[in-house]
Amino acid sequence: YIEQYGQPSSTADCSDHNFIGADPSVPKRTWQAWYDQNVPAKRIVFLSTSNVVIEQAVRDGIGLGMLPVHSVHGNPDMIQVMPPEQAWNVHLWAVTHRDLHRSAKVQAMLGLLSAI
């Protein structure tokens, strides 16, 4: 997408670009208010209820989209267009059974989640 249409240099430039969005039937994402303020409805060219489909649409060059940083980290084909805003952060709670909390498998998973 960037090779064909260029990269927005500011938030104001976003109104000149195509975007991938979340279907309105999905509960509001943390970044939805930013979309509502900065992306004209006519520039949202693809909607999905699935994060996996949204990510694939961005990878396929259909438009720009909001993706978790960890899902594209280390992928040379993906370019971070703008830094994430603090308001987009999502808190993740990991709950375990108290008898399993100290097991190696659970600790490994908690370590992986905390690295994200």
Question: What are the language-model segments listed below?
Answer:
Residues 1-92:
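C-terminal regulatory
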Residues 84-116:
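A late-sequence structural motif
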